[in-house]
């Protein structure tokens, strides 16, 4: 088991905090993120990037007078009228022709290059609209989460939707603050990227005690939040998911 210092997480801290430095937002073209959540995520971010058709979603929910900082992708989904309106209001549009990468990966790479230029290694990027539509899109979002975590282990990437949130926990010890006004009761630890040799938890209804997680063996789905602080120690990267009810 890794012995790194404990990493502290608060997936919905942005609901009660103003925009902070190195807090980026990527917007996807998904109905799983409604206007109230998108607006709160937007307000808490110092940089907003729409992934191709995410520009349509942002435009239709928030209007043309609130442009993102950038639109990134192959631009086969973003409407021409949306791009024109955004460019008129100062948004940078970046066409990236790479059929081996999806638009979320392109947007995350764009955010990462911006951090690199500023010497930032521990930023936070939140992805709005990662759930609720096509299952292959959800898996692509999780794949992007794993790739991002492997490339930038000190940074954090959180997937957000109106009904769920998820983030990758790297090998080591973690403490997660539970915001009971919006999170739970259900949660899970999912070994998406491969077997997790050992996981130990505190603060859940059914805690794990050094058990192995793997598809076809044990998956900690439909667990329940028990305490206001959840402690997790994992030997390998594992996906943390939590139910969300924004009211």
For each feature predicted by the language model, list its residue ranges.
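Solvent-exposed alpha-helices and their adjacent loops that cap or buttress functional pockets
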Residues: 14-21, 39-43, 63-64, 85-87, ...
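Long, charge-dense
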Residues: 74, 80-87, 97, 101, ...
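Long, charged alpha-helical interface segments
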Residues: 162, 168-247
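Short phosphate-binding loop-to-helix
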Residues: 90-119
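Short glycine/serine/threonine-rich phosphate/pyrophosphate-binding segments
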Residues: 34-36, 57, 101-107, 134-139
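N-terminal beta-strand-loop-alpha-helix module at the start
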Residues: 2-85, 89
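Anionic-ligand-binding alpha/beta catalytic cores of soluble enzymes and soluble regulatory domains
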Residues: 122-178
